[in-house]
A protein has these predicted regions:
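A general structural signal for well-ordered alpha-helical segments in protein cores
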Residues: 3, 18, 35, 46, ...
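Residue-level signal for inorganic ion chemistry
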Residues: 13, 32, 82, 107, ...
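Short, structured coil segments at secondary-structure junctions
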Residues: 24, 53, 121-122, 166
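Well-ordered beta-strand positions
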Residues: 27, 33, 124, 168-169
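ATP-dependent NMP and nucleoside kinases share a basic, alpha-helical "lid"
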Residues: 92-100, 105-138
Length: 197
């Protein structure tokens, strides 16, 4: 099975792209979504988060995401700490998820493939890019945060231009109408590359 990483900066439109791959029948694992679930359900992970960020980071057994975001997105050390707790749990979950799969290829959506230097774990990488202003607006609308918070979140990640050379496919997410065609082209290309080998 070919493992394809799908990545891109916050607000680039990775979920939109993933949904088009799903429509083509591609098995997609969304690491960020699974991480959110695990932070509310994995007792070992919950304990580690509480030990690192305080018991009051959970209210009625639910993670106070807004409070956690205000801590980690303005502090790289705290963000790195959170990632060091969450990523092993997500990786273990992904390994379990893959057991028994018969898919020709699977996409694992991971926002920070390059930031965590895990690009070598993937056979192919798809990078989703979008203009900074579009990303800022998406983050503000989605996360109900202010403009500066959105900019800080973007600045906590490696610039997209630095990811281009190590990516096999680039999707410029400027006009949503173009996305299905771009996704289909990449899908066919991946399938063809598998047939060749």
């Amino acid at each position: 099975m070919i493992l394809v990483g799908l990545t891109g900066g916050i607000g680039s439109g990775k979920s939109t792209v993933i949904n088009y791959f799903k429509e083509l029948g591609v098995n997609c694992y969304q690491a960020d979504k699974e991480a959110k679930k695990l932070m509310d359900s994995d007792q070992d992970l919950i304990r580690k988060i509480q030990n690192s960020f305080g018991d009051n980071i959970y209210i009625n057994s639910k993670l106070d995401r807004k409070k956690l975001a205000s801590i980690v997105f303005n502090n790289k050390e705290k963000l790195d700490l959170l990632n060091s707790l969450v990523h092993p749990a997500v990786n273990n979950h992904f390994i379990s998820y893959c057991i028994g799969l018969k898919d020709v290829y699977i996409i694992k959506e991971v926002a920070i493939i390059f930031e965590t230097k895990t690009q070598d774990k993937f056979d192919k990488i798809i990078l989703v890019k979008a203009p900074k202003e579009k990303r800022i607006n998406r983050i503000i609308n989605r996360d109900k945060c202010n403009r500066q918070d959105a900019i800080d979140r973007i600045n906590n990640q490696i610039d997209d231009e630095d990811k281009v050379d190590e990516s096999d496919y680039i999707i410029e997410n400027i006009n949503i109408i173009d996305i299905p065609k771009k996704v289909l082209k990449i899908h066919k290309n991946i399938l063809n590359s598998i047939k060749i080998h």
